[in-house]
Design a protein with these regions (language model features):
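Long, low-complexity, Lys/Arg-enriched
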Residues: 1-120, 130-182
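Conserved TIR/SEFIR loop-to-helix hotspot centered on a Trp-containing motif
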Residues: 127
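Conserved SAM-binding loop
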Residues: 124
């Protein structure tokens, strides 16, 4: 109702203040037994922090690195970072210098070298298509689990998934999806 009347900021505050804790709990409960724990989680950030928060809570990663673009500094500080600070405990922020494949791939690779681990995942939910494609290719090349947060129902009034309809979609699992070589 708030969004329909043009009160988008109030609708966003209502969502985070009233609904989001339940969304997190529901998401974590629904992914139990379906999502394996990982040592390191890489997340590509777009304009909404919710998917990153949901994925981190579900996977319980020991290390979490969130990547974002330089063009989002103002938006990041005002609209995204407060929610990351509120809902996540331990994470590292890394800014991509630009959105080129080479920069994204190399930045992800550098962070992987800094955080050696057995089990990695990369959440490709957020970011521009170039970022998502680069991150997915990197994840496949480096035997990461590649995943994203999807939804079964979208609420145009909220301008986000209907609370409780979020789903963790496991796109690629290196232990199951490696092609056979003859």
């Amino acid at each position: 109702e708030l969004s329909r009347s043009g009160r988008f900021l109030e609708a966003k505050d209502f969502y985070f203040d009233t609904l989001f804790d339940n969304v997190i709990d529901n998401f974590v409960e629904n992914t139990k037994g379906k999502a394996k724990k990982v040592d390191v989680l890489f997340s590509v950030l777009g304009f909404t922090p919710e998917p990153i928060i949901l994925t981190q809570r579900a996977l319980e990663a020991k290390e979490h690195v969130i990547f974002y673009t330089a063009t989002k500094d103002d938006c990041f500080e005002k609209d995204i970072n407060p929610y990351l600070q509120k809902y996540l405990k331990d994470y590292k922020l890394v800014r991509f210098g630009d959105e080129s494949f080479k920069t994204i791939y190399n930045t992800l690779s550098e962070q992987m070298k800094l955080l050696p681990a057995k089990e990695y995942a990369i959440d490709i939910t957020g970011g521009k298509k170039s970022m998502v494609a680069s991150a997915a290719i990197f994840g496949r090349d480096m035997n990461f689990n590649v995943l994203y947060v999807d939804y079964s129902d979208y609420n145009p009034d909220l301008r986000r998934p209907t609370p409780g309809s979020e789903i963790l979609n496991w796109v690629y699992d290196p232990y199951k999806d490696l092609p056979e070589f003859f």
